[in-house]
């Protein structure tokens, strides 16, 4: 019987419910259990694909092409699982499917209501995640905060789950905040008590409390919280601010969280103890890096940390492999000009230009890429970064001064980057990009092939609408650009590189989405190796 863990949050947002869910998932996975991660987002958008990065942060992409919440990236990296369309559900998706069923007549003329139709659909999504992944445990994070109007149907649905699948198969984990008042020099438990009271008022009794705090929570306060919330004191866990994400699951294990979960849900795990030896080695490495490598990220959304979270995580993963701390300096692409590029990049050891949409900042990207190419600074381009690297090469090496991307200039004569053929008649924006996992054939003797340890074929995740214009392939190759990765049908350019440079590689896909702390993605591994000048130092 599949077990279900629902992670909710109270008091304030951004408490780290996703990290809590991921940490529990990692511990259970390391006990030999198959874990499926799931995120419910209360917003009415179908998915975050059309949302401004400043509104939502990064859009994560799964193997099957789902555009999803960035928390799925945390799940994949921390738990080391692959997510799918069953892993991210929004209010928009729920209502869309309910209304489609109503239009088909599936409700036989009945009045469609939040209860039972919307709540039944939410429960169906939870159950479907279990069925389609054949999993032992589904861990579902409920976005938002207890008491939010938008979260109400989700809370009602997970309340009903306990009755429908049995209380022995459902566990509610509530993450809450214990603030420290510096003036009074004490922690306050009242917000937690009120949050649990609100949760209980809608019929959910939490089985475990995770107390987020910047200070250790004294035992007498845990006893008090237990008294007011009816949560056994042994099931009250503290989660302190940590210097590294790797600390969180280790702290949970020390507090016996995984054992409490398997005991509560009556799970007979294949391993009696979670094997966290490799995780501890990663934690030690992350805290005691010997070297430093400075990387400059030139992008469109640099003011928001979450906009490039997978990219920066992937850089750090590669840094662990070389025992080097990666110091990422982010520069707004719009701020870069021919006059200041030398000053802005004078101390960098590597340049990365990640993905994005629209025309803002393109000139700054091109200027920075030109400087990196001419001064042999290791460069990695991703998606839009690859497209701008191609435009830069056309303008400054092939001397096609009007070269551009059709996204920036639709009527451009030398459109080096063109709209994909199957996108020309596309009227909708949402969910219509080239999305998901696609193969690429790697050319022998290239840096790209070396990055992937000699593999002939790789599978990587994509999110784009434009592609390299194949009519320029021959001219590019004659001028020194190598097409080191091509789709199996030889149509779509996946990777370009200048092989005689220290490292100048750009990919149409998003390599950051498949990076893991203990397995850095190939292009990031090659990029940081070239930028740092260090040898691999395995931990």
Swiss-Prot record:
Name the UniProt record assigns to this protein: CTP synthase
Superkingdom, natural source: Bacteria
Binding site for ATP: 14-19, 71
Domain Glutamine amidotransferase type-1: 294-537
Role summary: Catalyzes the ATP-dependent amination of UTP to CTP with either L-glutamine or ammonia as the source of nitrogen. Regulates intracellular CTP levels through interactions with the four ribonucleotide triphosphates.
Record-annotated active site: 383, 510, 512
Family indicated by similarity: Belongs to the CTP synthase family.
More about this protein: CTPSs have evolved a hybrid strategy for distinguishing between UTP and CTP. The overlapping regions of the product feedback inhibitory and substrate sites recognize a common feature in both compounds, the triphosphate moiety. To differentiate isosteric substrate and product pyrimidine rings, an additional pocket far from the expected kinase/ligase catalytic site, specifically recognizes the cytosine and ribose portions of the product inhibitor.
Binding, CTP: 13, 148-150, 188-193, 224
Sorted UniProt keywords: ATP-binding, Glutamine amidotransferase, Ligase, Magnesium, Metal-binding, Nucleotide-binding, Pyrimidine biosynthesis
Known partners and oligomeric status: Homotetramer.
Coiled coil: none
Residues annotated to bind UTP: 13, 188-193, 224
Disulfide bond entries: none
EC number in record: 6.3.4.2
């Amino acid at each position: 019987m599949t077990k279900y863990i629902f992670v909710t949050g109270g008091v304030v947002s951004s408490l780290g419910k996703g990290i809590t869910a991921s940490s529990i998932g990692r511990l259970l996975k390391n006990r030999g259990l198959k874990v499926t991660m799931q995120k419910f987002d209360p917003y009415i958008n179908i998915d975050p694909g059309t949302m401004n990065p400043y509104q939502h942060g990064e859009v994560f992409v799964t193997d099957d092409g789902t555009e999803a919440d960035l928390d799925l990236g945390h799940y994949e990296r921390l738990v080391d699982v692959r997510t799918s369309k069953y892993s991210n559900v929004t209010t928009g998706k729920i209502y869309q499917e309910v209304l489609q069923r109503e239009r088909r007549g599936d409700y036989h003329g009945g009045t469609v209501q939040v209860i039972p139709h919307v709540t039944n659909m939410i429960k169906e999504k939870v159950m479907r995640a279990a069925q389609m992944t054949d999993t032992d445990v589904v861990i579902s994070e409920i976005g938002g905060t207890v008491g939010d109007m938008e979260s109400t149907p989700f809370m009602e649905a997970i309340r009903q789950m306990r009755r429908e699948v049995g209380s022995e198969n459902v566990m509610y984990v509530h993450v809450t905040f214990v603030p420290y008042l510096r003036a009074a020099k004490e922690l306050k438990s009242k917000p937690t008590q009120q949050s649990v009271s609100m949760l209980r008022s809608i019929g959910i009794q939490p089985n475990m409390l995770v107390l987020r705090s910047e200070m250790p929570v004294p035992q007498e306060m845990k006893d008090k919280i237990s008294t007011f919330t009816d949560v056994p004191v042994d099931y009250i866990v503290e989660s302190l601010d940590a210097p590294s994400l790797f600390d969180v699951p280790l702290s949970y294990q020390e507090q016996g969280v995984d054992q409490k979960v398997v005991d509560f849900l009556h799970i007979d795990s294949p391993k009696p103890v979670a094997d966290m030896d490799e995780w501890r080695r990663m934690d030690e490495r992350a805290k005691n890096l010997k070297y430093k490598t400075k990387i400059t990220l030139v992008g469109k959304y640099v003011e928001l940390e979450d906009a490039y979270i997978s990219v920066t995580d992937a850089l750090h993963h590669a840094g662990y492999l070389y025992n080097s701390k990666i110091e990422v300096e982010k520069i707004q692409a719009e701020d870069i000009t021919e006059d200041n590029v030398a000053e802005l990049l004078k101390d960098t050891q590597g340049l990365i230009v990640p993905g994005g949409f629209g025309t803002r900042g393109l000139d700054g990207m091109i200027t920075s890429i030109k400087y990196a190419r001419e001064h042999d600074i290791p460069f990695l381009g991703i998606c839009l970064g690859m497209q701008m690297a191609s435009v830069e090469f056309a303008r400054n090496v092939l001397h096609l001064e009007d070269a551009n991307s059709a996204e920036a200039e639709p009527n451009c004569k030398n459109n080096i980057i063109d709209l994909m053929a199957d996108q020309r008649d596309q009227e909708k924006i949402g969910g219509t990009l080239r999305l998901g996992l696609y193969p690429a054939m790697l050319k022998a003797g290239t840096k790209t092939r070396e990055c992937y340890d000699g593999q002939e074929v790789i599978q990587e995740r994509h999110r784009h609408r434009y592609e390299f214009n194949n009519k320029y392939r021959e001219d590019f190759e004659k001028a020194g650009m190598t097409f080191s990765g091509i789709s199996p049908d030889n149509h779509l350019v996946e990777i370009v590189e200048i092989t005689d440079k220290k490292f100048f590689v750009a990919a149409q896909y998003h390599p950051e989405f498949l990076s893991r702390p203990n397995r850095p993605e190939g292009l990031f591994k090659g990029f940081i190796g070239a930028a740092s000048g260090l040898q691999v130092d395995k931990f």
